[in-house]
């Protein structure tokens, strides 16, 4: 179990990982069983780019709207019939939360009858084996992979295999989906699945496709890494005209779409992550009529995507106007304007800008000016103790960068002149080393004068201030007489010791004076 959790954690982007944790915590607090399902599991196992997060709950996800919004998610749309929430999680992460359900089709082309189900029953209603897997995100079973149709084996074999015989009858949009997956992954369609597709074409089941399914397929084109290739494959299979009868590759701005993909890759390398989906739809439908575009927009379930697509040109024109005005009169002001603008607008404007001044400023923003950013005077800043540990460091570094952009700092002298007032005060000098020997004793005596009073008691008092004697300990009434100090021995030639005399009692008697008590 832990292996799939580990694989998930290393395959998700940091923002996607945060999104999984956000949904997981909300579901856990509500006591709802949660699974990561569908395309997300397929892409985690296969190694393809994880485009969005698909969650399935055993319960009603519509009841989680307030909690999800409070946690930071944006509700892009809600489908009451399918009990599905379309979310935009922090970091522009797309996600869906659907209820585990059974779909029973009573008639071709009619919406299914929906009823609650377990996660295994939910997996049985899906389209292809590679999409019929679920990963538990619940305590006690977290990391458990449910794969009742051996989808992991088909991923390893790189095959598109339908789940059951009536898959294309129940939901004709799966015909378009099969072609889209085969084109995206460059995987072949399994033989029996291919035979069922041909049978569905002969019976013209595609005419029963619902508007909801058409809208979902149009939306999915916006998220493809190579949408032009997908559109060409759909046109070859006669599926593109199903999405719109007037749509063809001739209506696509192929050059603009190619430049968009290239520019997005360049922005990704610089650390930017713009969402290209509104611009992708713009170029895919560049030569379609206004009515056709309006009809397509009505069918797309994510209304935030529709709004972004609709406002794309107007917002780009507004940004271009600001780039040619006083707000962008200097390089530093232009940098500030483009840094604060929506990344999607900058991406789209770089591809579509017609004014040379606008195009050049965006080009400088991603090119020449970033080279200036690499020339911050780090040596001078370090000399003045202006380091990243300072709370003010980001602002100081930004201010220096702005001055460098505008050409106001040239020499080392100018740089130091600007930085010195911003430098922190020098640190205090280090404490002196500890004193040793007589100096240490003298210092100790100065610190504790009472300790040196006693030795001075026997000496004459100095003419200075009198020193109070230390209190003496109480003396006992009878004190043994202290022995006299021994006399210093004279340095004479050694003499023979006199023989000792003994008394009658046998005790030795010292010759001469009475022996001193030692």
Question: PLM features: residue spans?
Answer:
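Catalytic cores of the polymerase beta-like nucleotidyltransferase superfamily
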Residues: 1-518
């Amino acid at each position: 179990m832990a292996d799939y959790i580990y694989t998930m954690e290393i395959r998700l982007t940091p923002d996607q990982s945060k999104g999984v944790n956000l949904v997981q915590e909300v579901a856990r607090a509500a006591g709802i069983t949660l699974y990561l399902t569908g395309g997300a599991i397929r892409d985690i196992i296969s190694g393809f780019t994880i485009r969005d997060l698909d969650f399935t709950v055993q319960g009603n996800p519509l009841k989680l709207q307030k909690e999800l919004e409070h946690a930071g998610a944006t509700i892009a749309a809600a489908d009451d019939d399918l009990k599905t929430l379309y979310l935009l999680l922090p970091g522009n992460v797309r996600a869906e939360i659907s209820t585990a359900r059974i779909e029973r089709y009573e008639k071709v082309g009619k919406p299914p009858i929906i009823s609650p189900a377990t996660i295994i029953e939910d997996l049985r209603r899906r389209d292809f084996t590679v999409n019929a897997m679920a990963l538990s995100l619940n305590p006690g079973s977290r990391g458990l992979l449910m794969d009742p149709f051996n989808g992991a084996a088909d991923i390893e074999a790189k095959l598109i295999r339908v789940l059951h015989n009536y898959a294309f009858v129940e939901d004709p949009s799966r015909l378009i989906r099969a072609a889209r997956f085969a084109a995206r992954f460059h995987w072949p369609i399994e033989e029996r699945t291919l035979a069922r597709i041909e049978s569905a074409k002969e019976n013209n089941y595609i005419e029963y496709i619902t508007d909801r399914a058409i809208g979902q397929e149009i939306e999915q084109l916006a998220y493809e890494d190579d949408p032009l290739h997908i559109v060409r494959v759909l046109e070859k299979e006669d599926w593109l005209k199903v999405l719109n009868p007037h749509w063809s590759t001739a209506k696509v701005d192929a050059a603009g779409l190619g430049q968009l993909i290239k520019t997005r890759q360049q922005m990704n390398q610089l650390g930017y992550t713009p969402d290209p989906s509104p611009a992708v739809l713009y170029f895919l439908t560049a030569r379609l009529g206004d009515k056709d575009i309006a009809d397509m927009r009505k069918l797309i379930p994510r209304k935030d995507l529709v709004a972004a697509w609709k406002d794309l040109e107007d917002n780009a024109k507004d940004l271009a106007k600001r780039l040619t005005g006083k707000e962008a009169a200097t390089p530093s002001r232009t940098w500030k304007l483009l840094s604060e603008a929506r990344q999607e607008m900058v991406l789209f404007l770089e591809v579509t800008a017609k004014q040379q001044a606008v195009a050049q400023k965006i080009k400088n923003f991603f090119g020449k000016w970033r080279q200036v950013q690499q020339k911050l005077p780090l040596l001078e800043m370090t000399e003045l103790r202006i380091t990243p540990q300072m709370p003010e460091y980001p602002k100081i570094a930004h201010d220096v960068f702005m001055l460098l952009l505008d050409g106001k700092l040239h020499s080392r002298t100018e740089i130091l002149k600007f930085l010195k007032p911003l430098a922190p005060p020098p640190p205090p000098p280090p404490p002196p080393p500890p004193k040793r020997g007589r100096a240490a004793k003298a210092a100790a005596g100065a610190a504790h004068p009472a300790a040196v009073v006693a030795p001075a008691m026997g000496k004459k008092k100095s003419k200075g201030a009198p020193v109070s004697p230390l209190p003496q300990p109480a003396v006992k009434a009878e004190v043994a007489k202290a022995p006299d100090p021994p006399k210093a021995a004279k340095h004479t030639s050694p003499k023979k010791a006199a023989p000792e005399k003994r008394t009658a009692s046998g005790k030795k008697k010292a010759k001469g004076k009475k022996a001193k008590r030692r």
